[in-house]
A protein has these predicted regions:
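Terminal RNA-binding accessory module
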Residues: 1-63, 67
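Rossmann-like S-adenosyl-L-methionine
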Residues: 4-14, 172-329
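Short, acidic/hydrophobic/Gly-rich beta-strand patch recurrent on exposed beta strands
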Residues: 14-19, 126-131, 295
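Short, conserved phosphate/pyrophosphate- and ester-handling motifs at nucleotide-, phospho-/glycolipid
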Residues: 31, 144, 241
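Conserved "cap/hinge" positions at secondary-structure junctions
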Residues: 38-40, 124, 169
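Extended interfacial segments that mediate partner engagement and assembly in macromolecular machines
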Residues: 51-63, 69-162
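A short glycine-rich, hydrophobically flanked beta-strand micro-motif that places a catalytic Asp/Glu
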Residues: 104-106, 162-171, 183, 263
Length: 329
């Protein structure tokens, strides 16, 4: 079956243009003519396999990673980096357009194309295959930081922990003394609960909105970001590209100040740590209650209020009361 690759969507797939049904095609570039084979067929869409590029885009390039197309990590290495960024901008614009929101010109914040990724998940010692349960053994990754690659090189595939483990490796890690490998390897296991700290003091009883949360000291990681210390759980989410994070923070938090600021989907409070310098009060909303524990630690000396609920729940049940207590944002 021959189709023309249309617009790119989140995840890197293109949607076939000349098809009655929506078909997602990996490893293509908008405008390319490709031969495909349907791998999975669903009611509203299909997922295809890219068999052959009949008419190549001028933006197509040779991927620099030997595992590209095998592991499920990267999706755009077949596209020249500058055009990748243009496609990402268009994908973001499309997302706003679908919600009826017009956006001004989008500023691109980018970093190096290699050696930037600090956060990895390994499954039985390897990476998951593209859209499969196959385990891909790797001993290096061009996108990984030096610290992560040192681990992959020194610990053979067969000697790595089984199950799913989370790795965070970066020169920015401050919780590991200099002279030691700057990497946190966290295995998923039964969590041991430790007390929540608020304003530097232990709470005898967690507040209701923190109930059911935990903090695992063995997987805790502290990084230095623009001279501020931020602690998070390596088992959870944290930005994997610290270079871009450090470039983004001044653009997001700089030049604004006031009484109250709302940090929706705050995670461990990364941006709130910087917003606290120019706002009197921070309100954090994060559905991952375990991340809220670290946000409390990171904002311990600052006036703030945290909610361990989803964004829609906060808007529906907490926003009105919060505004009455704190004032408008």
């Amino acid at each position: 079956m021959e189709v023309i690759a249309g617009k790119m969507v989140f995840g890197g797939d293109c949607i076939a243009e000349n098809s009655e049904k929506k078909i997602f095609i990996p490893y293509t570039i908008p405008g390319e003519k490709v031969e495909i084979e349907i791998e999975k067929d669903f009611k509203d869409y299909s997922v295809a396999k890219n068999l052959n590029i009949i008419e190549k885009s001028r933006y197509r390039t040779v991927p620099f990673c030997p595992y590209y197309g095998k592991c499920g990590g990267c999706n755009l290495q077949h596209i020249e980096p500058e055009f990748q960024r243009q496609l990402r901008v268009q994908t973001l614009k499309d997302a706003f357009f679908r919600e009826g929101i017009e956006v001004p010109q989008i500023q691109i914040v980018s970093g190096t194309d290699k050696g930037y990724r600090a956060r990895f998940q390994l499954h039985d010692g390897g990476l998951m295959g593209k859209r499969s349960n196959e385990i891909i053994p790797i001993d290096q990754c061009p996108c990984a930081t030096e610290e992560v690659n040192k681990y992959l090189k020194e610990i053979p595939f067969t000697e790595r922990p089984k199950g799913r483990i989370h790795i965070f490796g970066s020169k920015n890690i401050a919780s590991i003394p200099d002279g030691f490998d700057k990497i946190v390897v966290a295995e998923q296991s039964e969590k041991k609960q430790i007390p929540i700290k608020n304003n530097g003091k232990k709470q005898k009883k967690a507040k209701a909105r923190y109930e059911g949360t935990f903090s695992e000291s063995r997987s805790a990681c502290t990084v230095k970001i623009l001279d501020k210390s931020i602690t998070f759980d390596a088992l959870g989410f944290f930005q994997s590209n610290l270079e871009v994070l450090e470039k983004s923070i001044p653009l997001i938090t700089g030049g604004i100040s006031g009484k109250n600021v709302l940090d929706m989907y705050s995670g461990a409070g990364t941006f709130s740590v910087f917003l606290a310098d120019s706002f009197e009060n921070i309100v954090l909303v994060e559905h991952n209650k375990s991340a809220v524990v670290y946000a409390e630690q990171n904002l311990a000396e600052k006036k703030h209020k945290s909610f361990g609920v989803s964004g829609d729940v906060w808007v529906k049940y907490h926003a009105e009361t919060c505004i009455k207590e704190c004032g408008n944002f």
